[in-house]
Amino acid sequence: MTNKLDCLKLINFIEKSNLFTTNKIRDKKLLIAFSGGQDSSCLLTIFYILSKKWGFKLGAVYCNHCWTDSPQSSLSAFDTLQMFDIPFYFVESPNSEPMKPEQKARDWRYSSFYTISKWEDYDFVLTGHSLSDCVETVLFNLFRGSGLKGICSLKEDQKFSNLKTNDFFFQKTVCFLDPFFYFSDKKGNPFFRKYRLFQSMSFLSIFPKFDFFAFGENCAIDKSNFPLKNKSKGKNLQFLTSFDIKNWFGIKKICRFCFLDKIGQTGIKKKRGTNRVPILIFSRRVNKTTSPLALNFQTKNKRVDRKSFLFRFSLAFALPLAFALRAKGEKVRKNALLNQIKPVSFFFKTKKDKTETNLFHRYLQTIKKLQNRDKISSFITIFRPFILTLGNVKIKGKKIKNKNLPFQIKKLIRKKEKEKGILWNSLSKLDNKDKLISNQIQKKGFKLIPKFILTKDKKSFSNFPPFIFDQLEKTFRKEKVDTKPRNSSPQFEVLFNKLSQPSSDKKNVDFIVFRPLIKITRETLFLFSNNLKIPIYYDKSNKDLNITRNYIRKVLVPLLKKINPRVEENIYKFSKIIEFYYQVFGDLKCPSDRFDIFNP
């Protein structure tokens, strides 16, 4: 294989796949399974470039199996994901223990994908399986004595219907409703109004570019770390969270969140029948002027109590809940309230080593301590990009857009953005055709609908435009009398029942996984990543030849390539032939006498 590769040609090849030609990807949310390796990094880069043209939304998920004590793989994945302005999810294995064997790790991984997809409303999950992975799976199953089903195991798209959400992800976390914050001061500082706060079953998070927050429960707090004033009034004590924020405008601020059960200093009264609790924020600029911002948050029949905790992870500080004094009905001045708080750093010490002072490294240490102390089964953390860095928002007169991406990737993004106008013009023409067809159906009446359906093949029925489905279903519902036509064929009855069924809830829809790179070899992806200078982490465990898959990848496949350099493509084509026969005839059982072998 030559060292030159046309990266745009490879991206266009992906764009010709069934996922794009059937227009399934338009206005969808895609979750990419990211491991930090070569295949998943190329997959993320390709779809990030194509998202600028097609307009779909991306997210990435990284699962930490804790197979090694070194956090290097997680750190490299975190550094790579920071380059892209997309939300990404970090999943820690239960109790931070190694997830073994391989089948158990796979089940846990796919169950995590399904859980996140269900929470965050993702339509598809994309994995980075390549043609080389398909070949290795075929050889692996052949060596184990598999039948037709094992040879054609890796498909371009696959449905999982028996997966269940991992309840242990959110058993011990506070569940908040969305949206979480309601800004009451519209004339307040624009920095806080630019924050977006997100809800999930496991974590509530505020996310600038490199900062995040997480709420949880059942965390013991050492009261000795939080000195209290006026202990005689301890009955009226309330919790107050305290942390520092570095404004991306270059202004340092000190923020205070007061969790109060009753009327706070803002004067906002709690309405009957609601679960809103007042929160106070005090901000201090460099010039020592203060301006309060009043916020409300809505809970789901829960209150923040002594067992709850708030984490804030940043490049400088991470502070726990602190106790603050507030007497009932007493008006406490802002400066006096600020002076009462003595925050204590609780989970890291600054070290000279760069990896030790890294934000994500400290986060990993904290998660392990929490799980060892509180026996939390598993943790999911959501990282979202700071809203000011999205689009063409001007900060200090400069545009922040794809700032950390390599130049080669930016160049391909600009090319795809130019194709965006042509794409939407063509799609609008298709929509107009769909509208014309549906209008003709409605004008000619219901009797012509069976003819229109029956002219389509049974296989192409599922590829019908969604707009037509909506129009047909509306037409069926308009018929108040017996909607089933007389002398209808059995084929039409099946289609009719399928159309007349109510739309199923999204929670019960099958979990769909796509493998867009299944027709591309690992060598081609290696050239693609080199040309675009994509950062890749090479896992040392892949060199262990005691693992069967590594032995096939490192020893057997290179030997077969010496016989025929295109052996991977031939094995892949062979598996597709077997897959075709399996779909037509099913899993054929061979007579036992065909397997008679002489054993000396």
From Swiss-Prot:
Q: From its record, what is one biological process in GO terms?
A: tRNA modification
Gene3D superfamilies named among the record's database cross-references: HUPs (3.40.50.620)
Q: Which GO terms describe its cellular component?
A: chloroplast
The positions annotated for binding ATP are: 35-40
UniProt KW keywords? ATP-binding, Chloroplast, Ligase, Nucleotide-binding, Plastid, tRNA processing
Q: Which GO terms describe its molecular function?
A: ATP binding; tRNA(Ile)-lysidine synthase activity
**EC number of the protein:** 6.3.4.19
Domain of life, per the record?
Eukaryota
> What subcellular compartments does it reside in?
Plastid, Chloroplast
Question: SUPFAM superfamilies attached here?
Answer: Adenine nucleotide alpha hydrolases-like (SSF52402)
What is the enzyme's main class? ligase
Main function: Ligates lysine onto the cytidine present at position 34 of the AUA codon-specific tRNA(Ile) that contains the anticodon CAU, in an ATP-dependent manner. Cytidine is converted to lysidine, thus changing the amino acid specificity of the tRNA from methionine to isoleucine.
Name by which UniProt lists this protein = tRNA(Ile)-lysidine synthase, chloroplastic
Q: Which organism is it from?
A: Tupiella akineta
Which lineage? Eukaryota, Viridiplantae, Chlorophyta, Ulvophyceae, OUU clade
